[in-house]
Curated annotation (Swiss-Prot):
Disulfide bonds join C81-C158. The record marks E84 as: Plays an important role in the conformation switch to the active conformation. One of its GO terms (molecular function) is 11-cis retinal binding. This is Rhodopsin. Residues 1-7, 68-81, 145-173, 246-257 are extracellular. CDD domains: 7tmA_MWS_opsin. The gene is rho. The modification N6-(retinylidene)lysine is found at K267. The chain crosses the membrane at residues 8-32, 45-67, 82-104, 124-144, 174-195, 224-245, 258-279. PROSITE patterns: G_PROTEIN_RECEP_F1_1, G_PROTEIN_RECEP_F1_2, OPSIN.
């Protein structure tokens, strides 16, 4: 054991909790949407994509981590490490880019930067395809030699190699690519789109002399936007910041728990996503009930 056995028990219990909550909520999202035709709208396609991404994380990542935490190290070998790292990264990246597409969709629909634009099923499918292409552009390279997946933190799960500058894997360039393309750019797009969305709502409210209905609508949208941005930051900022610090300070001493705690926040997105993006959607909520 790298750390106290109690830490592995806590890790296993936390993974079990994520599976216990994450699987039913995301599966229910898929089921309810398929059962209720009125939910199958282009704008809801990306919410379904979020649920699929979260299920990838639950089934491909959390179950493996829970199993290996019982042994105190990653017992599934190189192939198992590659598979677990791939599916966990794929699910996380699909979710991340789904949030970007969702932000762009809402900006276009609400702010109307393109006059006479009507959001259709084809646009929704293009958004889904984009999120998958971007996710694969991050999760596949470590399988083919650009960086690699290695056991990380408490050695119970696998992730991209931020820790070493292993010869022949070009880990430095991949970390720079990931941090720029798969964190800073998505963060900038989300802040821009939701910032413009808030401004549009406030302008509309001012134009209507701040009626009670408009004020209530503005508050609902504002609350949703604030939660979206906070959810994104809570999930990804600790993990990205810690990974960047480790990359920039290779050779420094840090314990196994140092990277495990930020990973907890990133993995928790499988619960945050449906809570924020679906449970606060009145249509979904009414159909679930």
């Amino acid at each position: 054991y790298l750390v106290n056995p109690a830490a592995y028990a806590a890790l296993g219990a936390y993974m079990f909790l994520l599976i216990l909550i994450g699987f039913p909520v995301n599966f229910l999202t898929l089921y309810v949407t398929l059962e209720h035709k009125k939910l199958r709208t282009p704008l809801n396609y990306i919410l379904l994509n979020l649920a699929v991404a979260d299920l990838f994380m639950v089934l491909g990542g959390f179950t493996t981590t829970m199993y290996t935490s019982m042994h105190g190290y990653f017992v599934l070998g190189r192939l198992g490490c590659n598979l677990e790292g791939f599916f966990a990264t794929l699910g996380g990246e699909i979710a991340l880019w789904s949030l970007v597409v969702l932000a762009i969709e809402r900006w276009i629909v609400v702010c109307k930067p393109i006059s006479n634009f009507r959001f259709t099923e084809d646009h929704a499918i293009m958004g889904l395809a984009f999120s998958w292409v971007m996710a694969l552009s991050c999760s596949v390279p470590p399988l083919v030699g650009w960086s690699r997946y290695i056991p990380e933190a408490m050695q119970c799960s696998c992730g991209v190699d931020y820790y070493t500058r292993a010869e022949g894997f070009n880990t430095e360039s991949f970390v720079l690519y990931m941090f720029t393309v798969h964190f800073l750019i998505p963060l900038s797009v989300i802040f821009f789109c939701y910032g413009r969305l808030l401004c549009a709502v406030k302008e509309a409210a001012a134009a209507q002399q701040e009626s009670e209905t408009t004020q209530r609508s503005e508050k609902e949208v504002s609350r949703m936007v604030v939660l979206m941005v906070i959810g994104f930051l809570v999930c990804w900022l600790p993990y990205a910041s810690t990974a960047w610090w480790i990359f920039c300070n290779q050779g420094s001493e840090f314990g196994p728990v140092f990277m495990t705690i930020p990973a907890f926040f990133a993995k928790s997105s499988a619960i945050y996503n449906p809570m924020i993006y679906i449970c606060m959607n009145k249509q979904f909520r009414h159909c679930m009930i």
